[in-house]
Curated annotation (Swiss-Prot):
Residues 121-396 are annotated as: Xylosyltransferase activity. In the C-terminal section; belongs to the glycosyltransferase 49 family. CDD domains: GT8_LARGE_C. The gene is LARGE2. The chain crosses the membrane at residues 11-31. This is Xylosyl- and glucuronyltransferase LARGE2s.
């Protein structure tokens, strides 16, 4: 071995000497072309233009310096190999420095294989539950922000995350993004036998099964934890696959804490690992090679052997990956540590970077997440918050020069937008109707399990940020399940999250579903919001209300009893809850119908909108309601818009109506067209609380164009209703003309 090294060294020295001689001859010949010998004093030769001479000489010197630099680099690599006889452990630029060594690990490394333009990059993520589904959105945003290539995300999910992420990506409609889902329940038998103390539970072991879970024709994939933030183009990480040797199959960053050294506390006994071990928050997997090696059998045998003494894993899949690598060190490619800057309590991650430009990937691998202790944590937190609150609509940009695969929903939307007439006075209304809003279902933990109760009912409402203060009051008045659609920006959604987590009332409830519909466009998409909240209920019946109303105490139980007594499962009926209002922000809420009637007589309460829009609720017949003891039937009348309890499969709200006006009227009209009975409940009531006028109602009142467009939409709705229900819908058109 020593002899071989000396031969290589002599060969390189001879090469360098020859290169210097050739360079000298090259300069000599070149100088003759300019009419003088460069090694002679200037006065002895002919002197053409000094500028031309200086430029030619500088060019030749630069070439020689570049050649010498390349030769020195090759010599350094040979010396590094000869120092211990093992090129895998040489301190080359592509392996990155060890934590205790040189701190500068910028990417001034030997030339690496570049990712082809439009090459499809594959990313696998294990995601389960409501919280992880929320975290993964920030990861995806950071990837999309920097990316220049098409991406294919492979999500291993439970049923909750599947529903959330599938809806999110379908509504996001980002070009050149492909998404596949794999059922984690199918993979649980593969790892359920492994005891795991990590907070991630059984899902923290799922990455071991990727060779089986992912398609057999997928040869390589980047695997990420959900608590990752990218600060660079993920294609740079994908390019590292080109550096793997023939034996290397897994790319990992060294663990940046002393966990696997076993010196964190007394009697600490970690799983076996190579040196400091490796962190599995960022993994490069060559799946085809792993399958040929028999990866499944390899990790199983290792886990079984180690569990005999360790009894359980502490860091989930990471312990098993490290145990396998301990037995097979040739399998691992050491990624530079800036590809996984770990921010847990015991890490030494500051050794991985000296400047911002050194950062590639940040890993919040502590249960404390953003509250972790690190001297640069404020900088990292700000970088994370940038993507947390970043407007995801801005990421719907095309990749120039890369053809997207056909997407029927996207193509249909584009065609509909192209058919709009920009000179139409109502163009903005029609454009808003076609707007595709991002939707994040079940933004917070939701654990309501619908029992087989045929009379159960969910309160359904929608709101924006300015009505957030109503949530606690509604939760105090309504004990049953609630489905809410919230219209917010990305930043507002995070404000809401902090508000809900800090509220004792809201954080104590697990049967309230919050669905975020992200802002886009100039009008409030009120009926879209209602449809989102309605579509994601789990009970047979729904109470369709607005966020400004407080239901009477005990209304939830009263409605369930009424549904049963009226045998609603066997008839098509809508139960009307009479609406009242107060002008007082502080109200002693009536505990019974008798108290409400007393307050009504005293002028503390009023029938809803009696002085502004009496037609909206007059058909409820409040005079009859005062003395009624049993439900009574009322007939539909023009502009009637009561709040009702109906079956969950009722007609959807017409989404052409945005902003203010006719959004509930059109819905009640369609219920009547489908021959729903309208039954007023005698002992139910709700009270509207005062608030400042919305922006949309102000536009309605001030803009003649707004009101004109609303009238146009009403006429078009009547025409569509007539086509849908035939002669039965003519009465609505007649009633409209008689107004």
């Amino acid at each position: 071995m020593l002899c071989s090294w000396r031969v290589k060294l002599k060969l390189l020295l001879a090469t360098i000497t020859l290169a210097v001689l050739l360079s000298w001859l090259y300069l000599f010949v070149g100088s003759l072309e300019y009419g003088r010998f460069l090694l002679l004093p200037p006065c002895l030769g002919e002197q053409p233009s000094r500028d031309v001479e200086r430029e030619a000489l500088a060019s030749q010197v630069r070439r020689v310096e570049e050649e010498n630099q390349q030769l020195r680099m090759q010599l350094g690599q040979v010396q590094a190999e000869g120092s211990d006889g093992n090129p895998q452990w040489a301190a080359s630029a592509e392996d990155g420095p060890p934590l205790g060594g040189e701190r500068n690990n910028r990417t001034a490394c030997p030339e690496q294989r570049m990712v082809r333009k439009c090459e499809l990059l594959h990313v696998a993520i294990v995601c389960a539950g409501h919280n992880a589904s929320r975290d993964v959105v920030t990861l995806v945003k950071s990837i999309l922000f920097h990316r220049k290539n098409p991406l294919h995300f492979h999500f291993i999910t439970d049923s909750v995350a599947h529903q959330i992420l599938q809806t999110l990506f379908q509504s996001w409609m980002v070009p050149s993004i492909h998404v596949s889902f794999y059922n984690a329940d199918d993979l649980k038998p593969e790892v359920s036998w492994i005891p795991n103390k990590h907070y991630s539970g059984i899902y923290g072991l799922m990455k071991l099964t990727l060779t089986k879970a992912l398609p057999s024709n997928l040869s390589k994939v980047i695997v990420l934890d959900t608590d990752i933030t990218f600060a660079t183009d993920i294609a740079e990480l994908w390019a590292v696959f080109g550096k793997f040797s023939e034996k290397q199959v897994i790319g990992l960053v060294e663990n940046q804490s002393d966990w696997y050294l076993g010196n964190l506390w007394k009697n600490h006994k970690p799983w076996p690992a190579l040196g400091r071990g490796f962190n599995t928050g960022v993994i490069l997997l060559l799946l085809d090679r792993l399958r040929r090696l028999g990866w499944e059998q390899m990790w199983r045998l290792t886990a079984e052997r180690e569990l005999m003494s360790m009894l359980s894993t502490s860091l989930a899949d990471q312990d098993i990956f490290n145990a396998v690598i301990k037995q097979n060190p040739a399998l691992v490619y050491r990624l530079p540590c800036f590809w996984n800057v770990q921010l847990s309590d015991h890490t030494r991650s500051e050794l991985c970077y000296t400047e911002v430009s050194d950062l590639k990937v940040i890993h919040w691998n502590s249960p404390k997440k953003l509250r972790v202790k690190n001297k640069h944590v404020e900088f990292f937190r700000n970088l994370y918050l940038t993507f947390l609150e970043y407007d995801g609509n801005l990421l719907r940009r095309e990749l120039f020069g890369c053809a997207s695969l056909p997407s029927p929903p996207s193509d249909q939307l584009q065609q509909a937008l192209e058919e709009l007439d920009e000179d139409d006075p109502c163009y903005d209304f029609r454009r808003q109707h076609l707007t595709q809003h991002r939707v994040h279902l079940f933004f917070l933990q939701y654990e309501f399990l619908a029992l087989p109760n045929p009379t159960d009912v969910t309160l359904v409402a929608q709101l924006s940020m300015d009505r957030l203060q109503m949530l606690e009051a509604i939760c105090k008045h309504w004990a049953g399940p609630i489905s809410l659609a919230l219209y917010m920006s990305d930043a507002e959604a995070q404000q809401f999250l902090r508000y809900a987590q800090a509220s004792e009332v809201l954080s104590a409830r697990r049967n309230v579903a919050y669905h975020i519909v992200y802002k886009e466009g100039q009008f409030y998409p009120i009926n879209l919001l209602r449809n989102v909240a309605l579509a994601n209920t789990q009970t047979p019946y729904v109470f369709l209300t607005d966020i400004d109303f407080l239901p009477m105490y005990g209304l939830y139980d009263y409605l369930r009893n009424s549904i049963q007594q009226l045998e609603l499962p066997h008839r098509k009926a809508a139960l009307i809850v009479p609406a009242f209002e107060t002008l007082h922000y502080r109200l002693t809420f009536p505990k019974s119908k008798a108290e409400l009637l007393s307050m009504l007589d005293m002028g503390s309460l009023y029938t809803f909108r009696y002085h502004v829009w009496p037609k909206g609720h007059a058909p409820t017949d409040y005079a009859k309601w005062r003395t009624a003891t049993v439900p009574y039937r009322v007939a539909w009348q023009p502009d009637f818009e009561p709040y009702v309890v109906v079956r969950r499969d009722c007609p959807k709200y017409d989404q052409r109506f945005v902003g203010f006006g006719w959004n509930k009227v059109s819905h009640i009209m369609e219920l009547d067209a489908q021959e729903y009975e309208l039954l007023v409940l005698p002992n139910a009531f709700m009270i509207h609380m005062p608030h400042a006028p919305s922006f949309d109602i102000s536009k309605f009142r001030l803009s003649a164009g707004y009101r004109g467009c609303l009238q146009t939409l009403r006429e078009e709705f009547h025409q569509d209703l007539s086509r849908k229900y035939g002669a039965a819908a003519l009465k609505y058109l007649t009633a409209e003309r008689n107004l």
